[in-house]
């Protein structure tokens, strides 16, 4: 039986996105265990995602999508990550790029006419959105040069997860005009553009199958009408309050799923022999760290439920992001000890989780800026330039 026959690909016959993720995850897990080349992008998994209903899951039903909430999307990604971290992390980038305009369509009706075409394309054409957030963040990156009718873009976007499968890169570039502060322009660029090239750069410790290659943009012209937003470079903007509040709970749900699977593998290995008191204590510590990661991710999702993105929700989300990473990494490190020497074998699958969880360290806000942001909030100081 083929993979397509193993799952029911008709979303209408599914109860939840978690049901779909659970069945797909079993397939993805088998593929990850059997992979001969971990550096290879998980293209076959994305093909299944594309026909499963998960690509359009976050689009409002009025626009043809599944109408999944951020909580449901987070649970979906957590479930996928339990089986294959690379697939889940790469897909989280598409997922948050859908969830953000979906939230705005629901809560910012004035923006709906601008957002609807993109959301309808995701629902109808099942296009994959890429995020260049790892390159751009608050400061922006790349150069936008004013030309007749638009802007010529020159940029190299690193950490573009899912690049081999992407249809539209959601990105930006910095426009510098005499006598004015640098401005970041936001826009989408079709990956089919002759001015766009995916560079084969992704050779990493973990999350090897995400295809997070550099994307080179040389001379693509974005029409003036295709720039829906612009902001000052190097300053937090209300748009980024929305982006960061929604995106990071989704991304860190992936790392929670990785940690949960590492825990279960370790317990399974430990049970194969008579555990001593030391192993029992390590297992208890591991479960406490995992509980900490779960609480941290839940706090992040609680910030989304407020439906009021602001500096305060950024603070809550980024505190959660830091705690989620810290506790998830600690849980997986303890899983290696609980498993003992058996966990050192690649066949166990634990060492892949150990490598994958390390990527939790590198997303914004990293520890220094995050602590500074939280401290400034506590002291009533400005935070608009802390990132």
Located regions from the model:
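Glycine-rich beta->alpha junctions and the first turn(s) of the following alpha-helix
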Residues: 204-291
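Glycine-rich phosphate/pyrophosphate-binding beta-alpha loops
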Residues: 158-163, 248-250, 360
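Basic/polar N-terminal segments that are highly enriched at the extreme N-terminus
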Residues: 1-19, 23, 387
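DPxDG-like acidic metal-binding loop motif
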Residues: 156-193
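C-terminal helix-coil-helix/basic helical segment that borders enzyme active sites and/or dimer interfaces
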Residues: 29, 33-37, 271, 292-323, ...
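Glycine-rich flavin
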Residues: 43-51, 56-165
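Glycine-rich phosphate/cofactor-binding loops in nucleotide/flavin-utilizing enzymes
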Residues: 342-387
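Generic structural signal for well-ordered, non-transmembrane alpha-helical segments
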Residues: 22, 257, 284-291, 318, ...
């Amino acid at each position: 039986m083929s993979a397509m026959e193993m799952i029911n690909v008709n979303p209408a016959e599914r109860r939840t996105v978690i049901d779909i993720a659970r069945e797909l995850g079993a397939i993805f897990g088998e593929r990850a265990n059997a992979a001969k080349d971990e550096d290879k992008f998980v293209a076959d998994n994305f093909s299944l995602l594309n026909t499963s209903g998960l690509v359009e899951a976050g689009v409002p039903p009025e626009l043809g999508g599944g109408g999944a909430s951020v909580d449901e999307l987070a649970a979906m990604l957590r479930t996928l990550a339990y089986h294959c971290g690379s697939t889940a992390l790469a897909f989280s980038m598409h997922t948050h790029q859908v969830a953000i305009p979906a939230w705005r369509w629901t809560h910012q009706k004035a923006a709906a006419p601008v957002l609807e075409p993109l959301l309808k394309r995701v629902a109808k054409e099942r296009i994959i959105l890429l995020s260049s957030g790892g390159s751009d963040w608050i400061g922006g990156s790349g150069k936008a040069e004013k030309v007749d009718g638009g802007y010529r873009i020159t940029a190299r976007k690193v950490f573009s997860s899912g690049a081999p499968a992407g249809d539209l890169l959601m990105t930006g570039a910095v426009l510098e005009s005499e006598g004015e502060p640098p401005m970041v322009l936001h826009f989408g660029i079709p990956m089919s553009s002759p001015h766009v090239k995916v560079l084969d750069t992704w050779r990493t410790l973990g999350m090897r199958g995400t295809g997070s290659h550099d994307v080179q943009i040389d001379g693509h012209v974005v029409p003036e009408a295709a720039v829906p937003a612009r902001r000052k470079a190097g300053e937090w903007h209300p748009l980024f309050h929305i982006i960061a509040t929604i995106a990071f709970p989704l991304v860190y749900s992936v790392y929670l799923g990785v940690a949960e699977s590492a825990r279960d593998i370790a317990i399974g290995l430990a049970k194969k022999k008579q555990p001593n008191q030391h192993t029992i204590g390590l297992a208890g510590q591991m479960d406490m760290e995992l509980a900490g990661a779960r609480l941290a991710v839940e706090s992040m999702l609680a910030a989304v439920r407020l439906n009021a993105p602001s500096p305060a929700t950024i603070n809550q989300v980024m505190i959660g992001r830091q705690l989620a990473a810290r506790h998830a990494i600690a849980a997986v490190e303890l899983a290696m000890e609980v498993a003992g020497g058996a966990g050192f074998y690649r066949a166990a699958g634990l060492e892949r989780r150990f490598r994958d969880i390390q990527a939790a360290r590198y997303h914004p806000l990293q520890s220094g800026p995050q602590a500074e942001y939280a401290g400034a909030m506590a002291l009533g100081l400005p935070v608009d330039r802390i990132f």
